[in-house]
């Protein structure tokens, strides 16, 4: 995206422009529920609303870092097919993206960069080389991560802490046993930024692995609305 061209749209009447994608040259990147209070209306003219996966991961990682001190880690996304993908093989600048949408594809993702833009204290801790599994489903994504944390904790205490610290508007915890575990379609039109699967949360000494469910379209749109309503006041 050419930010210089976007800035040409600014005028006396149009004082701020919000972009629904990651844009490193934007004046400010916001994930609602993480850093919207740092927005300065007269200074931040071009505002990026990050990405759907950034909005899913950042609120959770903010709490984990504040409570348990993230040392380093990796993030991976499991993401449905995009509209740009075709049902049959065809040309594409990335060969794997040119393959039919019924395939499982491994591609690079900017989720780590999106997180670091709003949580700069995680720079150098979350690996920038993140990967995405593009899978042949229509809706609902998952963020999988492995983190090394400084403060050791049991799984039960970790879940209790996350549940206590989270804002229920942005985050949720899916409790239950193996027999009650939910699947992706159960989260369609769930407005929360992400929902932690307690059953799929594991802790081994100082290593934490987790799964976050999120409706990558509906929940992201709700956060876009929240952010614009808050920042345009």
Which positions does each model-derived feature cover?
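N-terminal Rossmann-like NAD(P) cofactor-binding subdomain of oxidoreductases
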Residues: 1-87, 91-93, 97, 202, ...
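Short, hydrophobic alpha-helical segments
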Residues: 149, 228-233
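A generic structural signal for alpha-helix starts
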Residues: 55, 151-153, 218-219
